[in-house]
Amino acid sequence: MARVTVEDCLDHVDNRFELVLVASKRARQLARQGMEPTVEWDNDKPTVVALREIAVGHVTKEILKQREQDYQTSSLDLALSTNSLNLEGFSF
């Protein structure tokens, strides 16, 4: 599929607003969580791949029920590890 149209995606999602939610969640999964795409990547950005997956029916609104990975935990771990540095003499 060379181009993805909104109409192609709306065959599988109820409305444009839900399409935005589904596509953004799937794009985040592809970009940040390392999920494997169900269509060929073709050097596209994650948002384009997400829309292509929706257009062919591989991704549906059921994705909205999935829980996202907690990135705050990893940020907290990072903050705790930097806290172990010697910061004497600095005021916070």
UniProtKB/Swiss-Prot annotation:
Biological classification of the source: Bacteria, Pseudomonadati, Pseudomonadota, Gammaproteobacteria, Moraxellales
Gene: rpoZ
Subunit structure: The RNAP catalytic core consists of 2 alpha, 1 beta, 1 beta' and 1 omega subunit. When a sigma factor is associated with the core the holoenzyme is formed, which can initiate transcription.
Pfam families recorded: RNA_pol_Rpb6 (PF01192)
Top class in the EC scheme: transferase
InterPro entries in the cross-refs: DNA-dir_RNA_pol_omega, Pol_omega/Rpo6/RPB6, RPB6/omega-like_sf
Keywords: DNA-directed RNA polymerase, Nucleotidyltransferase, Transcription, Transferase
This protein's record includes keyword Nucleotide-binding: no
Superkingdom, natural source: Bacteria
GO process terms (BP): DNA-templated transcription
Similarity remark: Belongs to the RNA polymerase subunit omega family.
Gene3D superfamilies: 3.90.940.10
A GO cellular component entry from the record: DNA-directed RNA polymerase complex
The protein's name in its UniProt record: DNA-directed RNA polymerase subunit omega
GO molecular function, one term: DNA-directed RNA polymerase activity
Keyword Cell membrane listed: no
Catalyzed reactions: RNA(n) + a ribonucleoside 5'-triphosphate = RNA(n+1) + diphosphate
Physiological role: Promotes RNA polymerase assembly. Latches the N- and C-terminal regions of the beta' subunit thereby facilitating its interaction with the beta and alpha subunits.
EC number: 2.7.7.6
